[in-house]
Amino acid sequence: MTSFAELLAGRRGLEFVKHAVLTFAGTWAKPGTGYPSWIVAGAIDALEAPIYEVPVQAPWSFGFIGSPDPKAPSYEESVQIAVEWAIAWILAHPFQTFAMVGYSQGAEAMSRVLLEIITPGGRLYHLRHNFIGGVTVGNPMREENHSGPGLLHSAGRGIAAKRLTNTPDTVVDIINEGDMYGQVPAGPKVLDKQAGDNITACYMAAVQLGLDINAATAVLAALTGKGGLAEQVLELLAKPLNVVALGKSITIALQFVAQNPPTAPHITYEWRPVHADGRTGIQYAVDHLGAIAAAPAAA
């Protein structure tokens, strides 16, 4: 259906320009499904945002052991496939303005692409003027204390070892309180930082394995040291865990995994308020995407 904005542009003899929105899905989601695609659809349907979706093609997998696909890549391999596909698409469309939306594993892939855009010498730095902004949900690479205007939760940092710095103002990081993938302690207390570092160390080891489980389960197993899975993860640690902070690390991971449903803060962004006005994470993301799509182009 033709939007009012398109009709108005036609009446004025102007070209109606739509921004591409690259969507980076979560683990085991098919490209073009899940939170990122919901956000794009919401901005189009509710706000008539001048955008169209470009689903990033990747397996969005977490390994082959226990998976119906014997060739399913590990999490780390899956993320890199997504990164390379997105970079290739952007390079192939040098005159196309674009936004990005990513969730969970997809948020990590999106963040790596963002680094290529905002970092001098990055593969996409020369096209940074085409980037209008973006949204992450439950981002493992979230910059410490970064979120978005008016958001309730910004403490801590993403669980990954490599994270964003100097995140552009047009990019918001949405997290639910207690979502361990997007929020581990970062200080200022030394014990908090050490606990966060323990969790990150186990996570970085877990994502290298070809295991069809969620990362939180692998992290908890490694922290508690129970079972064969713990041995596999611990063997990949770059350095020993901090014993003093181990109890706090286990508590954080256990609270995340033991919720009903397990990892609830990470999978309920359509229900939990993230803003003082009661908007959920998905509603806030829709509004932000609509706003950056409608903003005048930078000079």
Question: What are the roles of these predicted feature ranges?
Answer:
Residues A20-L22, A99:
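Conserved beta-strand elements of the Class I
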Residues I90, T97-V101:
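Structured, beta-strand-rich domain cores
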